[in-house]
C-alpha cells in the first residue's frame, strides 16, 4: 500500500514538473521569438561570409594555377617572392575585410539587442556625436530591415 502511494506521489510530482516546464516554455516563447530571428540572421550572415571567404580562396588558387597549368615558367613565377607577396597581401586584405564586416555586424546585432536606458538619453558620446532620446525611427527601420532580409532569405531557400 505504501509503495503504491509512493508511486502515485512520484507520478503526480513528475507530471507537475512537466506541466511547470511546459508553462515556463510557453511563457518564454514570445520573449525568445523576438531575438531568435535576429540571431538567425546573424548566424546566416556569418555563414555567408565564411562561404564567400572559402570560395574566394578557391577561385584565387584556380586563377593562379589555371593560366598555364603545365608551363615550366609557372614554377619560376611561383618560386619568386613577388607572387607569394601578392598572394599573402590579397589574403590579408580579405581577412581585414572579413574581420571588419564581422565586427560591424556583431556590433550592430548586440547594440540593437541590448540597448540600455542610459544609452537612449540625449548626450555627447566618445565620438562627439549627439545621441537623442528618439529611437523609434531607428527601431522601425531595424524591424523593417529585418523583415525584408527575412523575406529575401525565405525566397532564396
UniProtKB/Swiss-Prot annotation:
Lumenal side, ranges: 30-33
Induction note: Between 15 and 30 minutes due to fermentation progress.
Topology term for the membrane: Multi-pass membrane protein
Predominant subcellular localization, coarse grouping: endoplasmic reticulum
DNA repair listed as a keyword: no
TM region(s), chain numbering: 7-29, 34-56
Inactivation phenotype: Displays increased levels of spontaneous RAD52 foci in proliferating diploid cells.
GO cellular component, one term: endoplasmic reticulum membrane
Cytoplasmic topological domain residue ranges: 1-6, 57-157
Additional free-text comment from the UniProt record: Present with 4280 molecules/cell in log phase SD medium.
Task of the protein: Is probably involved in a pathway contributing to genomic integrity.
Protein name: Increased recombination centers protein 23
Organism from which the protein derives: Saccharomyces cerevisiae (strain ATCC 204508 / S288c) (Baker's yeast)
Amino acid at each position: 500500500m505504501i509503495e503504491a502511494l509512493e508511486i502515485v506521489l512520484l507520478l503526480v510530482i513528475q507530471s507537475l514538473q512537466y506541466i511547470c516546464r511546459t508553462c515556463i516554455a510557453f511563457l518564454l516563447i514570445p520573449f525568445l521569438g523576438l531575438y531568435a530571428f535576429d540571431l538567425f540572421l546573424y548566424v546566416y550572415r556569418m555563414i555567408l561570409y565564411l562561404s564567400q571567404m572559402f570560395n574566394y580562396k578557391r577561385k584565387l588558387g584556380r586563377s593562379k594555377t589555371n593560366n598555364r597549368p603545365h608551363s615550366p615558367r609557372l614554377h619560376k613565377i611561383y618560386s619568386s617572392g613577388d607572387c607569394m607577396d601578392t598572394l599573402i597581401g590579397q589574403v590579408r586584405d580579405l581577412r581585414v575585410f572579413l574581420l571588419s564586416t564581422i565586427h560591424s555586424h556583431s556590433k550592430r546585432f548586440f547594440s540593437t539587442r541590448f540597448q540600455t536606458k542610459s544609452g537612449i538619453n540625449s548626450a555627447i558620446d566618445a565620438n562627439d556625436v549627439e545621441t537623442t532620446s528618439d529611437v523609434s525611427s531607428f527601431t522601425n527601420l531595424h524591424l523593417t530591415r529585418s523583415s525584408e532580409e527575412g523575406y529575401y532569405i525565405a525566397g532564396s531557400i
